[in-house]
């Protein structure tokens, strides 16, 4: 029994009860005049408009007291729902008398009209109308029928869209807090409610006073606007603003968007047992470890520490109860640190870095306690997180239950995320220092200390290195028999001497015993070492070296290939061991290499002046021709920019030729550790042509490089590009994130539902081309997919792949070697599984390299894989200065959005609707168009194109239905009308692939 139940405070008349009711008891405001609900009137499509069959504009005039609406025409020539102005209303009253017809304004009028709607009858009429309606009329009828049937089903009445009462949310949900200095901070809702109450009370008073109609009308309109602002401020007219001209947040804003109730508080909550800190590199960590600062660990694992302290009991330095355990922790007793070590062991934690663009943005690690306040991250997982150590922060979460810990350990450990879900290539690969270390280690040099020495074992080689008898780059011989029995050497090879370098012997020690010895950076080496590297005992090895050219060092791409090979052959555990070894070796050797950069490493090009002189002379010639009127301004511009661009390329090739292979800057860019040729080119060559803010190329190039220094004008020209770079990055991130969200939204239901859908349709795939350039080779398209039909070698007639067999690397190689150009594979496009896809149509799971499992959320993975590289795509819509391509080419992210949204692309190509012959092409200079006539078997079509369109056909050419007449992107909506769904899907697929490949991003 509650003691104070039903007692009311005698001072202020408030019921005495628990404070919880402040969150649940609602109030209401009884309105003196009905008010329409803005969601139903202003929402798109307007629900009121559809029910009443009136335009939103007419409704607005009625609701906000601009026009009268006829409710009952009586025996006058007026029509029901006709709008009349104030003046017309007076005139009709004088003409027909005041009682003959009924017209009203405001929400009352709407309410009466809605109350008269007979839903059942309405639905019948609309169904009859649908039988013979077409086009716009039909669309509108369908929409109206949807709304009417929804009303019938829900049992709501249309007139309820007009409110007589406004509910008031509980006071704790719109709090008011006292600040120091006696002022109050309050929720915006209180202001909005106050406006409604004030206007409502004023209206009541005016009605009691029998005030003139126009004043009452004005007050009713103001009440309507106040309620609108309360429900959805800013939806109609200017938003009501509070202090500092800030629009007030209405009820709708509390729910809407990223900061709204749903996304902020229901889908994303702040959780306990989490923290965030700056990250720092932890080269001492193993692949599945992270360094956790002790301070954070004590806080994160508190309940576990308390539990363990109580288990220990006081006799072992622990505690008897929670209170004393808490005291021990607060006092930082030594026993707490010992317990912490125990608790943390084998308890995985999750690390997340925002923005989480793909599933590798959250991974599990085993914590290792470290001093300091920064969390330590393994250097190899930085790629997956897109993290660097310039002040990035990361969040950490502790899985509590046994199930959560098991899930983190089995599915999320960093060591098992070696391949990227987007293309199946290793995402953890050595970078920067580690790359340059392994590059330096595997470099060969001719004629240095100890060349031609022969050793009996790898240990002997390392001993000679320590004694400075040989160097890392020295070419030596080693007895092949000294290697492990498992090494795939033939008996003939084992009896001979293998030639290699000291560094490569050390590098090969980190590879598995039965993995081929890697001696040159070629993929053939993975199937066994080339026989030419084995010499008979007694051969003049020094003489052999003199005639043999040097093998290249292992660059970052090749290191990735090694990792992929190890993963394919030995699975996760061995790969993560290799990665750690590669990391340690890389750091060690790059430290020992003493690689530095100095000013004189930026080589100067003596020939540069000549090239620039030639270019200047050529530009002067072009300008002269323009002055004489031999060239148009556009032609002059194109030729000038082309001249400079050619000069740039010439200097670039000279620069590449002049680089010494020992030059540290060259080594950095060549190994793939940092920088690329265009960075070096700006340092030592010339900066080249720059773009103006409007995207047009400035025809005056920056001829200086950074080593010489830029003059003021050149520096100024360069700033455009820098500014564009910054703004682009900011815009790109937002756009790319939004694209990912929309993609996930549509694709999240696509799940692998069954083993085999039994479809009999496949997809013919061949290499995707763009002109003569291969965008994606056939190998990449068939790898990991199932064959729909048997693949037969055209030369021998043997079956390479049976029907429904998965095409793995070995089979794919055979198909390519047989010279086959097109393969029919099973594809998601032709899968017949309902609400998802089947295993056979999907194929291999990129992230594991195994066949996909039933239940895998492949839709979400695909959406993330497209969205994640989105930030690397450019935002550019190219503006070509001249008329050469007068349409702007949309590229990068905007192009991807254009394809997915199936919008009308910019500068689109016309598609032929008939198969036939091009009979004539006529230019009409007057209206700047050209007309292409195509004569089909049954009818002739004419296509009018802009005069600048570049045609794909000439007179007399044959053209097929659904082929493009001119250059440019196709409109998917047009394409699907004249061809099949499959062809359209294929076109969109190839186009998206093209955009990503042009930016050097692979998605499979």
UniProtKB/Swiss-Prot annotation:
Binding site for Zn(2+): 757, 831, 838, 841
UniProt protein name: DNA-directed RNA polymerase subunit beta'
Keywords linked to the UniProt accession: DNA-directed RNA polymerase, Magnesium, Metal-binding, Nucleotidyltransferase, Transcription, Transferase, Zinc
Organism: Oenococcus oeni
One GO MF term: metal ion binding
Role this protein plays: DNA-dependent RNA polymerase catalyzes the transcription of DNA into RNA using the four ribonucleoside triphosphates as substrates.
Cofactor(s) the protein requires to work: Mg(2+); Zn(2+)
Binding site for Mg(2+): 388, 390, 392
PANTHER family: DNA-DIRECTED RNA POLYMERASE, DNA-DIRECTED RNA POLYMERASE SUBUNIT BETA
Cystine pairs: none
């Amino acid at each position: 029994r509650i003691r104070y139940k039903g007692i009311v405070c005698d001072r202020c008349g408030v019921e005495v009860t628990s404070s919880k009711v402040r969150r649940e008891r609602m109030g209401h405001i009884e309105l003196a005049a009905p008010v329409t609900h803005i969601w139903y009137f202003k929402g798109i499509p307007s629900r009121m408009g559809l029910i009443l069959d009136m335009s939103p504009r007419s409704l607005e005039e009625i609701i906000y007291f601009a026009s009268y609406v006829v409710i009952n025409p009586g025996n006058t020539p007026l029509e029901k729902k006709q709008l009349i102005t104030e003046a017309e209303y007076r005139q009709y009253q004088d003409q027909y008398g005041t009682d003959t017809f009924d017209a009203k304004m405001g929400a009352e009028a709407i309410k009466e009209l809605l109350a008269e709607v007979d839903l059942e009858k309405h639905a019948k009429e609309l169904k009859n109308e649908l039988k013979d309606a077409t086009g716009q009329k039909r669309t509108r009828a369908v929409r109206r029928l949807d709304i009417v049937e929804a009303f019938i089903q829900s049992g709501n009445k249309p007139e309820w869209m007009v409110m007589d009462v406004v509910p008031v949310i509980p006071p704790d949900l719109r709090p008011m807090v006292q600040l120091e200095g006696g002022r109050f901070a309050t929720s915006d809702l209180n202001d909005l409610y106050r406006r409604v109450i004030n206007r409502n009370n004023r209206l009541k008073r005016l009605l009691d006073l029998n005030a003139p109609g126009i004043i009452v009308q004005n007050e009713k309109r103001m009440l309507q606007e106040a309620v609108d602002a309360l429900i959805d401020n800013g939806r109609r007219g200017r938003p009501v603003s509070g202090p500092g001209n800030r629009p007030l947040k209405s009820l709708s804003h509390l729910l809407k968007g990223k900061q709204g109730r749903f996304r902020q508080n229901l889908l994303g909550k702040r959780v306990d047992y989490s923290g965030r800190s700056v990250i720092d590199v932890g080269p001492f960590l193993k692949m599945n470890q992270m360094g956790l600062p002790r301070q954070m660990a004590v806080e994160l694992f508190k309940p576990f520490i308390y539990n363990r302290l109580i288990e220990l009991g006081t006799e072992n330095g622990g505690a008897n109860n929670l209170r004393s355990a808490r005291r021990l922790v607060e006092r930082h007793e030594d026993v707490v640190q010992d317990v912490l070590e125990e608790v943390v062991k084998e308890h995985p934690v999750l690390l997340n870095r925002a923005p989480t663009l793909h599933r590798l943005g959250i991974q599990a690690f085993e914590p290792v306690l470290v001093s300091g306040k920064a969390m330590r991250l393994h250097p190899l997982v930085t790629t997956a997180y897109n993290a660097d150590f310039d002040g990035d922060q990361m969040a950490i979460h502790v899985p509590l239950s046994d199930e959560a810990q098991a899930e983190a350990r089995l599915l999320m450990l960093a060591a098992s995320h070696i391949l990227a879900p987007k293309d199946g290539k290793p995402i953890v690969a050595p970078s920067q220092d580690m790359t340059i270390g392994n590059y330096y280690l595997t470099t060969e040099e001719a004629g240095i200390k100890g060349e031609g020495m022969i050793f009996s074992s790898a240990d002997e080689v390392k001993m000679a290195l320590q004694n400075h008898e040989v160097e890392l780059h020295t070419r030596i011989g080693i007895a092949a028999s000294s290697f492990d029995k498992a090494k795939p050497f033939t008996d003939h090879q084992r009896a001979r001497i293998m030639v290699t370098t000291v560094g490569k012997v050390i590098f090969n020690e980190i590879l598995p015993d039965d993995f081929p010895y890697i001696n040159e950076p070629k993929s053939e080496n993975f199937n066994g070492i080339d026989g030419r590297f084995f010499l008979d005992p007694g051969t003049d090895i020094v003489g052999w070296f003199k005639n043999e050219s040097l093998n290249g060092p292992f660059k970052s791409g090749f290191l990735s290939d090694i990792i992929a090979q190890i993963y394919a052959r030995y699975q996760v555990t061995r790969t993560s061991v290799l990665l750690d070894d590669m990391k340690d070796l890389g750091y060690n050797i790059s430290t020992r290499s003493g690689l530095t950069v100095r000013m004189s490493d930026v080589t100067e090009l003596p020939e540069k002046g000549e090239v620039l002189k030639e270019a200047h002379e050529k530009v002067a010639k072009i300008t002269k021709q323009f002055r004489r009127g031999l060239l148009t301004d556009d032609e002059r511009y194109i030729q000038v920019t082309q001249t400079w661009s050619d000069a740039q390329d010439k200097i670039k090739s000279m620069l590449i030729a002049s680089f010494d292979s020992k030059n540290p800057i060259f080594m950095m860019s060549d190994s793939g550790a940092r920088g690329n040729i265009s960075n070096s080119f700006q340092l030592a060559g010339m900066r080249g042509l720059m773009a103006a803010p409007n995207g047009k190329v400035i025809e005056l190039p920056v001829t200086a490089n950074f080593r010489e220094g830029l003059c003021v004008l050149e520096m100024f020209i360069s700033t455009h590009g820098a500014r564009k770079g910054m703004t682009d990055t900011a815009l790109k991130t937002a756009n790319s994130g939004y694209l990912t969200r929309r993609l996930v939204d549509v694709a999240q239901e696509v799940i692998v539902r069954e083993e085999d859908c039994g479809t009999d349709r496949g997809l013919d795939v061949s290499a995707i081309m763009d002109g003569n350039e291969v965008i994606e080779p056939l190998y990449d398209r068939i790898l990991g997919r199932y064959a729909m039909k048997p693949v037969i070698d055209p030369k021998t007639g043997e079956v390479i792949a049976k029907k429904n067999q998965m095409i793995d690397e070995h089979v794919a190689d055979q198909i390519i070697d047989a010279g086959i150009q097109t393969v029919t594979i099973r594809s998601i496009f032709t899968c017949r599984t309902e609400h998802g896809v089947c295993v056979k149509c999907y194929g291999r799971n990129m992230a594991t390299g195994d066949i996909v499992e039933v239940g895998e959320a492949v839709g979400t993975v695909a959406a993330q894989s497209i969205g994640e590289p989105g930030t690397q795509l450019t935002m550019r819509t190219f503006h070509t200065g001249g008329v050469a391509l007068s349409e702007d080419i949309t590229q990068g992210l905007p192009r991807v959005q254009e394809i997915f949204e199936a919008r009308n692309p910019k500068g689109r190509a016309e598609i032929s609707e008939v198969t036939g012959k091009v009979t004539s092409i006529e230019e009409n200079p007057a209206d700047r168009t050209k007309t292409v006539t195509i004569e089909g078997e049954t009818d002739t079509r004419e296509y009018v194109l802009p005069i600048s369109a570049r045609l794909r056909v000439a007179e007399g050419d044959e053209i097929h239905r659904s082929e493009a007449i001119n250059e440019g992107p196709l409109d998917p909506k047009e394409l699907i009308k004249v061809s099949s769904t499959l062809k359209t899907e294929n076109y969109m697929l190839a186009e998206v692939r093209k955009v990503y490949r042009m930016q050097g991003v692979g998605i499979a």
